[in-house]
């Protein structure tokens, strides 16, 4: 069987980007040493991360959002997300910040 696992949060792509930027800024304000680890980041210089966002011409067939239908997983497995979108994003971002040795060799 195949199941889609989603968070029940259907958001426009731009909202996702804005939320990521806000969470990065929040992390820089709350986590000691981030500015030293990432000195080129806008937040390390006191600038908002959203300043990195630029607008480009949409490609043909551009998706304004991506939605996952987890209805089958809910019905057959009793699945339900444990976190809302913003909390889950914050948790994911903090995991990556805490596990740089895992992802750094991949970039």
Give, region by region, the residue ranges found by the protein language model.
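C-terminal substrate-binding subdomain of Rossmann-fold SDR/epimerase-dehydratase oxidoreductases
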Residues: 1-107
